[in-house]
Amino acid sequence: MTVQTLAIVVLLVSFFVMIFLRFPIAYAVGLSSVLCLMVQGQALSDVCRLMVKGISSFSLMAVPFFITMGVLMGSGGISEKLIALADACVGWMRGGMAMVNIVASYFFGGISGSASADTASIGSIMIPMMVDQGYDADFSTAVTITSSCEGLLVPPSHNMVIYATTAGGISVGSLFLAGYLPGALLAIVLMIGSYIISVKENYPKGSPFTIKGFIKQLGTSIWALAAVVIVVFGVVGGVFTATESAAIAVIYSLLVSVFVYKGLDWKGVWHALDECVNTLSIVLILIATSAVFGNCLTMLHVPDLAANAITSVTSNPYIIALLIDLIILVLGCIMDMAPIILIATPILLPIATSIGIDPIQFGIIMVLNCGIGLLTPPVGSVLFIGSAVAKRPMEKVVKATLPFYLCMFIALLLLTYVPDISLAIPKLLGGYVSPIANPLGPVFIH
């Protein structure tokens, strides 16, 4: 066995053993990288250098600001405003409260960018409300946790910033624009699934739609929705960078939460900032250790080996794309979102681009794949949060979620094989030019 082969075995085996032993993911990534470097005879001082280099990125400065913005808005009483707006839009439909839940998650996702925050904030309000109106508790929880994944796609999303930094050379603004249609697609397929179940179970309709009611609720929610406009259109319009827009959005969110909606006092602001620091410390140590892990993968030529392994199975690009989806889905069952993006992107992105998948399109595919993983045992953090909020056994929630897994997989396949769902808005509004000469799937906008 060569040193290269031994190092690869040590790196991957030690990593997955520590994952299954429930080591904190950052420790598993870091320790397996150290063992790999030791096998290769590398100086351990390289670990510190690579960790510092991994977090020394101007783009990554946006991550703490986006996390802070989401926590401030989520703690500032905004959830009720967005639920009321969603109710004015779609509450009149059969299974109206399920539809409201899904649309409210789309709105809230554009502010928090976090599936966990969406589940906790929207779920704590919507699940009891749905149960009171005759909806099954497990169905209500399933709708809540699956719709929370919209927030991962709708900008601003700090996971998209992490992907853009890891992939290299990708515009954060274009990636933000790319998330709107996929997020809407996911919402639509979930609404179709909810409608079918609601008709079968004879769940009630809400109040009739009125223009007056919609305008009233839009007026009360406009302050919250404006935060998204500041971030996305500020970046796309070239007014400021993603980091600058995130910093401005934090100040705006603080002012709106404290002085406009008055959902936060200064003590609440302190608690929100404390939560941000805790979350950020986890994210940054993970990014730092993943930089060492990624360096090990590159030195050992693991991306090339993975590409050769996949192409040895089939040369059909459509099947290779499906295999990539399945690999990320399996990883999502045992790992959280950020480490998958940090570790899998350097391996899978070159394979994806070689078969005609645009880097921005692949970012959207990666994020949705990871989102499905957040709902899947045994790791499934959003699944655990939803079960805890609803006080329902996890196995019953999983059973109720099965039809929605199918809906999400349909959305995933559409995003994989129809590039323009992800790329249409960046091309039309952001002037994005795809580097892929022969895209996988039909292209309608050039």
How should these model regions be labeled?
Residues M1-H446:
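Alpha-helical transmembrane segments of multi-pass membrane transport proteins
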